[in-house]
Amino acid sequence: MNNFDFHSPASVADATKALGAGDDGCYLAGGQSLLPAMKTGLSMPTDLVGLDKIAQLKGICTSAPGAGRPALHIGAMTTHAAVAANADVIRLIPALARLADGIGDSAVRARGTLGGSLGLNDPAACYPAGVLGLGASITTDRRSIAADDFFKGLYETALEPGELITEVIFPIPEKAAWMKFKQPASRFSMVGVFVSKGPAGVRVAVTGAGHFAFRARALEAALEKQWSPASCDGVAIAPAGLNADIHASAAYRAHLITVLAKRAVAQTV
């Protein structure tokens, strides 16, 4: 691991200032991906800006009455374990609690964060499918970014240099479910599918199958006509452009998308 300067700010303003003052700095959230990358030399930042002491970035709350449509607000530094155990998440979006509870193992869930997962945008991560599948918005220190505009490519997002995720706002769906076919050793998604019906319409978001999370438009169109498991029958997902590796071929992943979407919808009816 290379030498670096460590900063521990207590506010978002101080965090962005510290990062801007460094030559090649990184924000440190839970460290579940960044620290292993630093240990192997894949990432060599000159400065690490720890976010753990910024209270503004932690916590879960609901929109105040009269603030428009009800929504769930989750701070970027909220851990997976906290999301999974939160009473409001379990009551309002139980599928999101289930998603968080299935990430990694207990050690990963105790340290890993919502904002860290989204900022990295690992192609097999769970949260991108949940955020995209619920039509959430990502709030940063500069602006609000719709989920549809956030995920750009392999480990690539709409975030600009130095931009910091502060919270994610989830609209409350009428129905939602999450299904994951996991790689047993890592518990990452070989394919994961999040379905929802609500203020953002019908959405089917997929992770693990492509270079980044995406919406399965053919399945959405079928479910718009009728929200039932049978609507997924006969919807073929093209394997072209999907991931293929030692765990699964592109054709198998394409098949899993439809199978998991059908199972997810079945959970909601």
Where are these regions (language model features)?
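C-terminal structural segment of proteins
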Residues: 1-269
